[in-house]
Regions:
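Active-site entrance/lid segments in N-terminal catalytic domains of soluble metabolic enzymes
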Residues: 1-255, 261, 291
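Alpha/beta catalytic cores of nucleotide-metabolism and tRNA/nucleoside-modifying enzymes
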Residues: 1-27, 96-97, 114-128, 232-264, ...
Length: 376
């Protein structure tokens, strides 16, 4: 892809967001009832490629269990309210009632709420609650807190471990502390690790070489994030997913057959976004906003991420999304909305069938078109 000159001393690469691309239907169509949306990472197989984002407004132990029983994977935020407070419900209620007209005071109060220390015994209790339900157990920590709490996570019986930050590299350099050695950490861990976010080919390939089972693709693209405004950094998702999918293919050859899963994470607000992410090369999608619209979601129709309460530099906001139905209706319908906010698995099956594909791996070969002028 050729560079575009910004000025005499600087050029830039043209990249594309999900809104800039669309799928092209093919000559052959399929019956959507024959479409298989299953996804498997390591020894764990799921009916759908839906991963619940580790955000307090999206995933509680109860919603992680519910999502697991509906065929997806719920990832619990192990630095959230459920591991800081014995009973977080009053605080969740308070966050949803903070004044929308005064975002500064709302952010200040959220920072105060999240200042409570993480309690290892609550990490254990929450993960054991999920495990006792019989679903696959997954928890998430940031790179900064992984070293301190990972043993608690593993001992509590996590099946999958997620290391999730705004941007994670295999070669973080710091003069103030000893950074997490991802390759050594993953090698010594008996649990499969998904790690991210990443935004490009080189960064992703380096993470794949650490032994990660999956790589999360995305940087500051979520609907509740203000990273682009605050830091001036952005990675349009269509290009990011395609680049990381290319890294996966090259690493497959380099490693002699080791397949690392690509999980699109961020900016996937409606069913069409999920469909395009999977067609661009993602194996699965980590979603927040679509699940935050479920009646069971702990945010009660409000959506916020971990960046919203950062002590040093908040890069997120509470966003009112409203409730569109139960979690089952959000995933499988029936849908009473025409905007892609419910029956998202049904939408995926219909799109795959329309484009002539019966499984997700082959769907990654779907033809795409560029429609940068279209916003409908």
């Amino acid at each position: 892809m050729s560079d575009i000159q910004i000025g005499l001393s600087k050029s830039a690469r043209r990249t594309y967001a999900l809104d800039d691309v669309a799928l092209a239907p093919t000559r052959r169509t399929r019956d959507r009832r024959d479409v298989d949306t299953s996804w498997q990472i390591d020894a764990f197989k799921f009916d759908t490629p839906i991963v619940g984002a580790p955000m307090d407004s999206v995933m509680s132990p109860a919603t992680a269990i519910a999502l697991g029983k509906l065929g997806g994977l719920g990832v619990l935020n192990l630095e959230g309210l459920w591991t800081r407070y014995e009973d977080p419900q009053p605080l969740l209620d308070e966050i949803t009632e903070l004044p929308e007209a005064d975002p500064a005071s709302a952010t200040t109060r959220m920072q105060q709420i999240y200042a409570e220390p993480i309690k290892p015994e609550l990490i254990t209790a929450r993960l054991e609650e999920i495990r006792d339900s019989g679903v696959i157990v997954a928890g998430s920590l940031t790179p900064q807190n992984t070293q301190e709490h990972y043993e608690t996570v593993v001992q509590a019986g996590a099946d999958l471990f997620v290391i999730r930050g705004a941007s994670v590299s295999a070669e973080h350099i710091s003069t103030s502390h000893e950074p997490l050695n991802l390759k050594k950490f993953i090698y010594e861990l008996d649990v499969p690790v998904m790690v991210g976010g990443v935004a490009g080919y080189t960064q992703a390939k380096h993470l794949m070489r650490t032994g990660a089972a999956g790589v999360l693709v995305g940087f500051g693209g979520g609907s509740a994030m203000t990273t682009r405004k605050g830091l001036g950094i952005s990675a349009p998702m269509a290009t990011a997913i395609a680049d990381v999918a290319a890294a996966r293919s090259d690493y497959l050859d380099e490693s002699g057959g080791r397949y690392v899963h690509v999980i699109a994470d961020g900016g996937l607000s409606r069913s069409g976004d999920l469909v395009k992410a999977l067609a661009l090369g993602a194996d699965a999608v980590m979603i927040g906003a679509p699940l935050a619209r479920a009646s069971e979601a702990p945010g009660q129709g409000w959506y916020w991420g971990n960046e919203a309460h950062s002590r040093d530099f908040p890069r997120g906001v509470r966003t009112p999304l409203g409730v569109v139905g139960t979690l089952e209706e959000v995933l499988y319908g029936p849908s009473h909305h025409v905007d892609g906010t419910s029956n998202i698995v049904g939408a995926l099956k219909r799109a795959m069938a329309t484009c002539g594909y019966l499984d997700l791996k082959k769907f990654q070969k779907a033809e795409m078109t560029l429609v940068p002028e279209y916003r409908g």
